[in-house]
């Protein structure tokens, strides 16, 4: 399976990744909602599907020459406006912070992508007041971010770094099953949240797959 270009990721590649995010959230909406019916209010998949449909429409509205950073910030604001529940502000913040980190770059090299991912994770953590181990999106995102950066710092290209990051994200997602929820609606379940996959961790994994794989 092919991955991101080994050198740079321009706005065309970013648009393609975001359109994949719409397709993958549509495809898995029912499964995400089933997960959320156990730990949340049973609408996570539907909300994300609506949000990324709105992102798809945004991509048709924005000029093709829109820089990646501006594009990501616009996506973040659209997600905040259209995704219900806690996930809209969380994912929206992640995209907005990544966009700010991108600055006015016309193309995103692997080192810049690593910095953008870290900014996204830090922003999400601040907005959600969550840490790794709280049974949230961050349990998937932070291991992926750390693994991507470590791979790039060791000299790997983006393709290999993304492959490693997706593997780390999958492991992080699965790590939420035995955890007790410490944030969100699942917090009210206490020990009863053990044994269930966190829906936000699952959707984060899917979005990282969309970014990494055509």
Regions found by a protein language model. Name each.
Residues 1-214:
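N-terminal loops that bind phosphate or other acidic moieties
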């Amino acid at each position: 399976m092919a991955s991101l270009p080994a050198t740079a990721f321009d706005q065309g590649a970013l648009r393609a990744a975001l359109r994949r995010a719409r397709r993958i959230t549509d495809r898995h909406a029912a499964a995400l909602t089933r997960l959320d019916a156990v730990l949340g209010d049973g609408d996570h998949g539907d909300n994300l599907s609506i949000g990324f449909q709105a992102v798809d429409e945004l991509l048709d509205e924005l000029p093709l020459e829109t820089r990646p950073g501006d594009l990501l910030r616009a996506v973040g604001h659209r997600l905040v406006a259209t995704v219900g529940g806690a996930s809209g502000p969380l994912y929206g913040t992640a995209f907005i912070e990544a966009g700010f980190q991108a600055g006015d770059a016309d193309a995103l090299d692997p080192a810049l992508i690593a910095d953008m991912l870290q900014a996204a994770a830090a922003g999400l953590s601040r907005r959600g007041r969550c840490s790794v181990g709280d049974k949230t999106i961050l349990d998937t995102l932070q291991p992926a971010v750390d693994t991507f950066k470590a791979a790039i710092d060791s000299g790997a290209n983006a393709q290999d770094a993304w492959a490693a990051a997706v593997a780390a994200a999958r492991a992080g997602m699965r790590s939420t099953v035995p955890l007790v929820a410490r944030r969100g609606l699942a917090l009210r379940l206490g020990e009863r949240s053990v044994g269930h996959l966190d829906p936000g961790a699952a959707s984060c994994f899917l979005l990282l797959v969309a970014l990494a794989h055509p």
